[in-house]
């Protein structure tokens, strides 16, 4: 009898998994203690995620769906059970993965964490309204109070009580006057003049008019209180809650209302409600940008990028160089009419001529129609044509073409605030809701802690609970190292690590208990300094009664955990076993690759020498994007460069949002606009830029390492040359799963079918026709060395290297995949199943297999994400090979093994957010370690043994 399984089954204090065979897991048994912090570690591709997400989480999700009604389950379809014998002790499971929260431009940190919802409630309940016309405080009264105020202010004075009906609108209003006359009213005030309502009265329908109904004329006296009361009630009814008082003696006007109103201008606001402060609601959103904060506008700089060129030579990009056609003839006529020609440089054309060319004109100009005729016509302009193409819903191609001439600019009406004028004129302690949304979380925490003192007793009673909720959520964001962010930061602009920590903070704030949380590398993007705060937050979540599983490679996280499960020993088919399970103390004495790195038996060595580079530089000047403070950076070329700094210090803004877009525009005509900068020098020393990120290598199960590296075309060509293929007349397309012919049509060559789960993520199930092989029966009958095309795609890279050893064109491409440590993945493994680290290494392998000039700049943003110590060692070998070829590798990184291995470092800081945005230190790792300004220096000294 197998006693290990019996022990696992009997132990009710743990999540007990046994017989797990998902992906590469080899029938493993694992016990994860309840109410403890457990780290699952191992090499990239060893099976960590297969255990944590594809087994434990998948089974938790399946059991949750089984609790639904049969109707709901039918709507969702059947969730397949993970390949596991049994899981006991499983509590409700919440998965927090390293994916960007939301690509929707309306999603912000404030909306995701619900802090903005509480702010909306706060402003709706205690915000003080101010008129955007006069700056006066808005007021509202009861009818009784209005009567008291009129008697007090106008006692003994002749007044006219009126009801505002029309405010500055066009129309003849004949029907309105007729209705008022029938109700017995005698006078109206039209555009400031009182006149009698005579039969047939009507106004100029094409002019704007303001109309008020005269309800009563009286000399205000206390004894007439009842009359005044009736008058006010009638005027309120006719004026939709607003009355207007005109004092004859001093020619003054005042407004009174039961709703919020400006007593000077008569401007009224709706009764405040939370949706009035939402940029996702028509009641709160800016009418110009519809709550987005930006608008798309035609950019003259994109239409005419080079003003020194002539129109004939192609200065107007949408038109290109001169062609003998109608539009060029029109533009030629406009130029000649003003005494210029198409060959005049654009910078020498007068503004009015250029304006006519771009925007058109209404003047009929004589055009030369050839030998026999002349004709006259108006010209619409280049901009109108581009706008027509942009608005063409029928043609995506036309829209894409027009889109290249547009730029996104801050909305001119709301200045990026997303809200309408009314919503932005409610204040608490002198700040509107947008002011709070733009504050860094650390500053907003201070404001919420002190603002209660600035409120009246009544406001304090209303706001106390709301402020408490806001403060607690801000506290949790601060605890996970996100104090440098602001609530209006777009969710799509967050890194995977930031998104995950936001979700973590939200979960800590929810105070759920008896839940199993599974997190995927929460330390991504976190500086070593902030790691302790993250670990403390996870322990807080554990201490209130939850079980935490973290898939992680961070040494500090492992040592601070309660329990470690090490999956390995290697990756792919050589992994999938539990090589260690126990406490961190026990692990230090164990014999695994992970343990060897933690206890110091293995290490990533410090390079014996630092390279000097090729003597050339790429100099970026005057960077001011986001929090960058007019930064100048001089990148030495031919080196492994590293950008370091605490979270939010400006690393990504400098590299991903400034340098990379500039180079992409230069080399590839990219449409992405760089952040503000002055100039970039040294471009002549770089001939290509390659951004190697961790995004998937494709968007569908059809993309894989073989298609991405281009080796699949060579493999298909081998199959086409086989005698059986020639007899059957098969062409390369027969062996493609992207086109009809040879592929399985039931799954369209995917090998899987996607089952729509409505409000849950879609589930992929193997195709029942081809059993996941992707091809039809006839195609699979063609074999090379006894293997079908599907068998070849099912080979690991290591197997393929042996199989194709006599085919240099194929071997060269797949050998590189083996060299970057991906020998365990399958040639045809769908890109959707590759981790971020694996995708990145496939991209690096593709670049390594190409011939390069040695002047390429490679940009990598946190390439160590998802990588084990051993994987990082392999990655550094690949990066160093690229540098040895003469290229420059620029890495944004927090991992100390990579930082200590760099030739040259730029450390950003000193802090995050507004306190960052400067280069505080630069030089070799040894020079950075000696810096007193750098926060990274202390951690680097430890790594360098100083």
Predicted regions and their residues:
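Conserved phosphate-binding elements of NTP-dependent enzyme cores
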Residues: 1-946
């Amino acid at each position: 009898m197998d006693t290990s399984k019996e022990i696992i089954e009997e132990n009710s204090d743990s999540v007990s998994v046994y017989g797990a065979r998902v992906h590469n897991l080899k029938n493993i048994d694992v016990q994860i203690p309840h109410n403890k912090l457990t780290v699952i570690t191992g090499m990239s591709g060893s099976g960590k995620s297969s255990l944590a997400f594809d087994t434990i989480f998948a089974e938790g999700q399946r059991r949750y769906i089984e609790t639904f009604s049969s109707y709901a389950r039918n709507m969702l379809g059947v969730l397949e059970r993970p390949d596991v014998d049994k899981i006991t002790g499983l509590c409700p499971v919440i998965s927090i993965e390293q994916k960007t929260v939301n690509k929707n431009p309306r999603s912000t940190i404030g909306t995701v964490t619900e802090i903005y919802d509480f702010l909306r409630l706060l402003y709706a309940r205690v915000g003080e309204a101010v008129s955007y016309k006069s700056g006066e405080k808005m007021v509202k009264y009861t009818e009784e109070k209005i009567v008291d105020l009129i008697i007090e202010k106008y006692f003994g004075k002749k007044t006219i009580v009126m009801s505002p009906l029309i405010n500055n609108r066009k129309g003849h209003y004949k029907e309105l006057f007729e209705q008022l006359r029938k109700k017995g009213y005698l006078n109206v005030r039209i555009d400031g003049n009182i006149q009698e309502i005579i039969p047939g009265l009507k106004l100029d329908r094409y002019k704007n008019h303001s109309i008020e109904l005269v309800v009563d004329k009286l000399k205000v006296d206390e004894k007439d209180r009842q009359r005044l009361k009736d008058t006010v009630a009638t005027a309120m009814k006719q004026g939709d809650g607003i009355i207007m008082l005109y004092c004859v003696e001093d020619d003054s006007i005042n407004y009174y209302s039961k709703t919020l109103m400006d007593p000077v201008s008569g401007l009224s606001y709706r009764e405040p409600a939370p949706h009035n402060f939402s940029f996702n609601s028509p009641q709160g959103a800016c009418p110009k940008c519809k709550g987005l904060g930006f608008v798309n506008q035609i950019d003259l700089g994109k239409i005419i990028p080079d003003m020194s060129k002539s129109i004939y030579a192609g200065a107007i990009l949408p038109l290109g160089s001169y062609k003998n056609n109608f539009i060029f003839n029109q533009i030629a006529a406009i130029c000649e009419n003003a005494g210029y020609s198409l060959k005049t440089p654009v910078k020498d054309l007068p503004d009015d001529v250029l304006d006519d060319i771009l925007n058109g004109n209404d003047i009929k100009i004589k055009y030369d129609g050839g030998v026999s005729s002349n004709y006259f016509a108006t010209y619409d302009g280049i901009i109108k044509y581009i706008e027509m193409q942009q608005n063409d819903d029928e043609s995506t191609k036309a829209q894409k073409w027009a889109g290249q001439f547009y730029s996104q600019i801050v909305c001119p009406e709301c200045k990026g605030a997303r809200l309408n004028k009314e919503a932005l004129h409610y204040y608490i302690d002198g700040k509107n809701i947008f002011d709070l949304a733009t504050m860094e979380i650390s500053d907003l925490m201070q404001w919420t802690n002190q603002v209660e003192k600035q409120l009246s007793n009544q406001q304090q009673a209303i706001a106390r609970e709301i402020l408490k909720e806001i403060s607690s959520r801000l506290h949790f964001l601060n605890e996970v190292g996100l104090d440098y962010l602001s609530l209006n930061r777009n969710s799509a602009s967050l890194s995977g690590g930031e998104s995950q920590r936001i979700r973590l903070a939200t979960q800590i704030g929810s105070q759920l208990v008896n839940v199993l949380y599974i997190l995927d590398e929460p330390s991504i993007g976190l500086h070593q300094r902030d790691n302790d705060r993250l670990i403390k937050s996870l322990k807080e979540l554990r201490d209130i009664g939850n079980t935490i599983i973290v898939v992680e490679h961070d040494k500090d996280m492992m040592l601070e955990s309660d329990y470690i499960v090490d999956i390995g020993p290697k990756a792919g088919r050589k992994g999938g076993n539990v090589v260690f399970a126990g406490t961190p103390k026990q692990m230090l004495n164990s014999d695994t690759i992970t343990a060897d790195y933690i206890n110091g038996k293995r290490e990533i060595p410090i390079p014996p020498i630092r390279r000097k580079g090729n003597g050339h530089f790429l100099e970026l000047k005057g960077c001011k994007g986001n929090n960058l403070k007019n930064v100048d950076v001089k990148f030495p070329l031919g080196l492994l460069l590293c950008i370091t700094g605490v979270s939010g210090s400006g690393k990504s803004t400098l590299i991903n949002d400034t340098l990379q877009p500039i180079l992409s525009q230069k080399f590839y005509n990219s449409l992405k606009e760089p952040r503000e900068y002055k100039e970039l020098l040294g471009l002549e020393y770089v001939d290509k830029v390659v951004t190697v990120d961790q995004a998937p290598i494709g968007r569908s199960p059809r993309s894989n390492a073989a298609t991405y590296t281009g080796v699949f075309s060579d493999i298909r060509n081998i199959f086409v040359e086989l005698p059986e293929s020639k007899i059957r007349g098969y062409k390369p397309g027969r062996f493609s799963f992207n086109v009809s012919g040879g592929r399985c049509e039931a799954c369209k060559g995917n090998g899987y079918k996607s089952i729509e789960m409505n409000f849950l993520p879609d589930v992929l199930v193997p195709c029942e026709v081809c059993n996941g092989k992707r091809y039809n029966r006839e195609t699979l009958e063609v074999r090379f060395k006894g293997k079908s095309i599907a068998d070849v795609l099912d080979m690991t890279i290591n197997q393929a290297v042996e199989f194709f050893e006599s085919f240099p064109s194929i071997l060269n491409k797949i050998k590189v995949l083996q060299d970057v440590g991906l020998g365990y993945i399958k040639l045809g493994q769908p890109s959707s199943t590759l981790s971020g680290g694996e995708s990145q290494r496939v991209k690096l392998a593709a670049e390594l297999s190409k011939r390069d000039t040695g002047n390429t700049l490679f940009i990598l943003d946190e390439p160590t994400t998802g990588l084990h110590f051993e994987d990082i060692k392999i990655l550094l070998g690949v990066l160093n090979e690229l540098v040895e070829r003469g290229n420059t590798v620029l890495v944004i990184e927090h991992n100390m093994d990579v930082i200590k291995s760099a030739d040259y470092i730029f450390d950003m800081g000193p802090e995050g957010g507004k306190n960052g945005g400067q280069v505080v230190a630069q030089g070799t790792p040894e020079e950075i370690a000696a810096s007193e300004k750098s926060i990274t220096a202390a951690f680097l000294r430890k790594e360098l043994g100083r």
